[in-house]
Amino acid sequence: MGLDMYLTGDKFVPEYQDKFPRAKVDSYPVESQRLKMGYWRKHWALHNYIEANYNDGESLGKVELGPISLREIADAVEQGKLPDADYRGEIDAYHKEPDQVAATVKTLRDAADWLEKDDNTWKTVEYYGSW
């Protein structure tokens, strides 16, 4: 068994937006979309950091993250401030590789930028870890 980690974005288009009519699927208007923004496998250090610093204890693995939180997490990843995961050496080392660090930082910062984009929609970003 392993840890699968998802960063998703939900985008809701208000019905009153005449300039931005809702798309249709099977002739029904689409009021929201779920976007796959990021995925990690067995990145225990990142998971433990998010759970320790951003989970209110009641979310059962789901944590809503705002732009400030996403940037704080990206900074912690970039600066090597995640706690040691002590999961398995080769997996923990993989997530510390420069290209993996850069990809994680980019994913988190892109999600923060997406939240702040003013496009007359309502948006949320959620982290979810499943094991």
Residue ranges of each PLM-predicted region?
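Acidic (Asp/Glu-rich) sequence patches and key acidic residues
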Residues: 1-124, 128-131
